[in-house]
A protein has these predicted regions:
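Solvent-exposed, amphipathic alpha-helical segments
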Residues: 15-22, 65, 69-76, 110, ...
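Hydrophobic/aromatic residues within well-ordered alpha-helical segments
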Residues: 51, 58, 62, 66, ...
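Hydrophobic alpha-helical connector segments
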Residues: 57, 71-103
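Short, hydrophobic secondary-structure boundary micro-motifs
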Residues: 112-114
C-alpha cells in the first residue's frame, strides 16, 4: 500500500523536533534524525540540503510571526494620539502578549526549540529582537510624554535594557514551563501589571 504523500517529510520533522529538543541545534546529529525517521540520507537531501535548513523549516514561520505580531502592536500603539497613548500605556502590550501566548502555547515544542535549542542558528535571538523593539518603543514613548509637558527623567540605557530583557525573559518563562493555558494567561496579565507599574514609577508618572 503506498504511503500518504508527505509521510516521509512528516517523519523527518518529528524526528528532528525530538533530536533538537533533546540536544539543541549544535549537538543534534543529522545521522540520528535520518535513522529515527527511517529514511535514507539520500531521501533526506531530497528535502533539505543541511541541518540548518531543516531547523529553519521547523521554526522560521513561528519565529517571524511573533516578531511581526509584536511590531504590529508597537506601530498600532504609536498610531494613537499622544493623549490616547497615555491612557492605553500598558494595555496594548498586555493584549499583544496574551495574543502571542495563545499562539505560542499551541506550538510549545517549536518555541522551546527557538528559546532553548537554537544556539548556532539565526533563530537564537528572538528575545534580543523583541528587546530591541521594546527599548526603541519605550524611548519614543518617553518623548511623547515630554511633548505633553511631563517631566520624564533620562533613563540610563543600561538600566532600560536590563528591565526590558527581564520582562521579555519573564514572558517567555511562561511558555517554557508546562502549565495550563488559563494559569499562563493569568501570569501574563499579572506580569503586565507589574511591569507597567514599574515603568510608570521610573518615568515619573
Amino acid at each position: 500500500m503506498p504511503q500518504p504523500i508527505g509521510s516521509t517529510l512528516d517523519r523527518i520533522h518529528a524526528a528532528a523536533r525530538d533530536e533538537f529538543l533533546a540536544k539543541g541545534y549544535q549537538a543534534a546529529s543529522l545521522r540520528n534524525i535520518v535513522k529515527t525517521a527511517g529514511v535514507t540520507t539520500g531521501a533526506f537531501y531530497g528535502y533539505y540540503d543541511s541541518k540548518e535548513a531543516l531547523f529553519a523549516a521547523l521554526v522560521d514561520e513561528p519565529y517571524r510571526r511573533v516578531l511581526e505580531t509584536y511590531r504590529t502592536a508597537v506601530f498600532g500603539f504609536e498610531a494613537l494620539r499622544p493623549e490616547e497613548q497615555v491612557t492605553q500605556m500598558g494595555q496594548v502590550g498586555k493584549t499583544c502578549m496574551q495574543e502571542l501566548l495563545v499562539y505560542m502555547d499551541a506550538r510549545r515544542p517549536v518555541f522551546r526549540l527557538i528559546l532553548q535549542g537554537a544556539e548556532g542558528t539565526p533563530y537564537a535571538g528572538l528575545i534580543d529582537e523583541l528587546v530591541a523593539m521594546e527599548v526603541a518603543a519605550t524611548e519614543r514613548y518617553c518623548e511623547v510624554l515630554r511633548s505633553l509637558g511631563s517631566a520624564v527623567p533620562q533613563i540610563d540605557p543600561r538600566l532600560e535594557h536590563m528591565l526590558v530583557t527581564g520582562m521579555m525573559n519573564a514572558y517567555c518563562e511562561v511558555i517554557l514551563h508546562d502549565m495550563p493555558l488559563a494559569d499562563a494567561q493569568r501570569y501574563v496579565e499579572e506580569l503586565g501589571d507589574f511591569y507597567t507599574a514599574g515603568w510608570l514609577k521610573i518615568m515619573g508618572q
